[in-house]
């Protein structure tokens, strides 16, 4: 039915009806009303009632049988009720091998009718596009759930834990990361913290002093500089005893850029990339989805995301940006970087012409230089370049290369003055190049496993699946490559048939089918997430809210209604006190269970 296709595209029911009216020439020619569409949608959702979780597990296990690189695991509670799961496919696992140095993790809600929490692991590829490494569904946001999810993520990724992970300030998640990723640098989302200043400071203080606090946070190059600037800003604003600011200062090692600028972050300092990913996926999914509906729509969104990456790969392979100068380094890097990173490098190279280099000191081991802008203002500060002569290494105080992986304008100015015409390989980060995805990826740690036959078969299948997938990605970028690989597949397929006829096929028994499961999986309960509850109203909003109106006397804001209004005649119906209290509870709700005051 066309309505089901509209629903899969996340077209609201009211808009579906308008489209049917336009197609039919008016509402009188449609043959049904909007209520009929809603009833049909409900009947489709009811088809999965009671078997939704089991259908989801069956689907994932069938995916695992079709592709041995697909990873999936789940857990149930003591009542065999579905509580959490994690999944990732071969494309995401291979992407993690190339781009898994930095991971952004953030949870979101309203993606399925059970309220299960959607928890994707995302990163950034060589085109600076958001990519998915894996996903989880959780029934709660407790430490145990996060520990389970992070362990499954680690189990799926042969590359190991990321170097850096960016999250919000959730204490349960923070504890879980310290347990599962003890060597990973954990950073809090800077954007979220900066946005809280307007809530935590009174309006006058925020207006007068926020800019100086923000400058201390964003423009400090070292931890000493930040602490000095922060202390001055707190003193000027008389905020030394502010509880929240004191807490944030104690946590400064987890969110202030000065403490992280030496750690590669792929240019990210917040979880906004994860939140933009949430917004992208929510264009395809809704809170009414069953688990299977969610997965079907999620996969459609994922295919769209990966198509954009293939388009960018195609552009890099078949289009060449126009050179802006005759500097040899420019013609070198235009063939190395992806278009996105090339444009960033070009901007740095263009800006480098506005800087001059001043020698401070040169010794046997180090050379110290100041790099200053020709049009430097009194507020701008020079950058300090350190040249380590022994290894011919260049370090700039702006730390852009360490943080983003792109040589800064100060380094390029130094190279130009010293007639370095080609960028040394040590300053070319492979993850930003067109060859970034040319990496080895083997999910098994033992190439020559001598174990049970089914393990040997699985090991061989994993390796061949990866190589075939990598070839398909490369060949599909061009028509010629597609035709060539297709012909080679036909040739190899015939050779494999002949080979298997003359060779003993070694392997093991088939994996147990999901339908052989001993105990049925129960659908998850509707989950009340920590963000639920009635919205807390400000005192101003409460003051302007109108009270109850008695329909007997017409007065508003009184403590009675028509049933016990004193202005009515003696024959009026008067209910007892218990009924009145029951009515009040129904109108206003109770604090316990319906409001989250924490």
Regions inferred by a protein language model and the residue ranges of each:
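Charge-rich, intrinsically disordered regulatory segments
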Residues: 4, 12, 21, 151-158, ...
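Conserved beta-strand -> loop -> alpha-helix junction used to position metal-binding or nucleic-acid-contacting
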Residues: 34-37, 129, 133-135, 164-171, ...
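Structured nucleic-acid-interacting core domains from mobile-element enzymes and related host factors
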Residues: 43-118, 124-125, 244-249, 260, ...
